[in-house]
């Protein structure tokens, strides 16, 4: 009888130990991934880019008797809980990624997300969202689920009692973004680099639309030689020597235009045939509506207008360039329905290999 009781006690102890280990591995209950039921929101923060995983910071580990398993599939991970704020001095500590800690960067520490990786952090109290780069482990020993740098906490306006939501952003090798953190979200590029303009010639053999691909360089006065002893502007054909027609999309300088030569005919038909103009038929078909298709954002207004005009001529739709802080958004539309905007999205993808998203006119 004593042996039977001893066996029962041992079995009960083993069962309790297993239950305790499982409890240690669990953290905060995982909410369902965000589902997009509204308009696309543009957020800023760290600029997500593809990075290989750190060789030493992505192994399962134990700390203070608690086991931690590294998240292998961030696409199935979301988490909500209280956020901590890491306020160490710059360079005072090394992160798990081997980098010196910098509180001015939009970074965060998480116990189990891959290093390095990116996540959208949402302040559930005020709705603010930013992108942070996960480059460290922690926090430990409290009920916090993530530790934010001071810069990230300030952008989100969080305190030590603020509840946040963590949604990973997955960066593919080609730079495309996916994952829970991209639901109803597009990330504003910090480099504002203009993508390579698509081939708008349709394979017809013309190179008129490929001219503006490079940056527009200033003309050096030292290369211009005037035959006029008074130093009058050069009147030969070329960029400053109109009347030679400029390539479509090329921007004229602010220099005064020389007097037209007698042999030049009045360019009365130029506005009607310029490829940068949107046809009246296209404008009348889509002049009203609340849906826009955004294809990019750049820091140069002139380049944004040039790019929008090229796309408008190619796809036969109106468009606009709007300012948002330091960048200029390139948008096509408006469209009366989201279905019409989606049709243009598909054409942009198949005919010009351009990524875009649908937004509402403001």
From Swiss-Prot:
Q: Where is the lipid attached (S-diacylglycerol cysteine)?
A: 18
Q: Where is the lipid attached (N-palmitoyl cysteine)?
A: 18
Please state the Enzyme Commission number of this protein: 4.2.2.-
* Topological type in the membrane: Lipid-anchor
Q: Does the keyword Transferase apply?
A: no
Write out the ranges of the annotated region (Disordered): 198-276
Which residues lie in Low complexity bias regions?
Answer: 262-276
Return the Gene3D superfamilies for the record.
RlpA-like domain (2.40.40.10), Sporulation related repeat (3.30.70.1070)
* Keywords associated with the record: Cell membrane, Cell wall biogenesis/degradation, Lipoprotein, Lyase, Membrane, Palmitate, Signal
Signal peptide span: 1-17
Q: What does this protein do?
A: Lytic transglycosylase with a strong preference for naked glycan strands that lack stem peptides.
Its name, as the record gives it, is Endolytic peptidoglycan transglycosylase RlpA
Specify the species. Escherichia coli (strain K12)
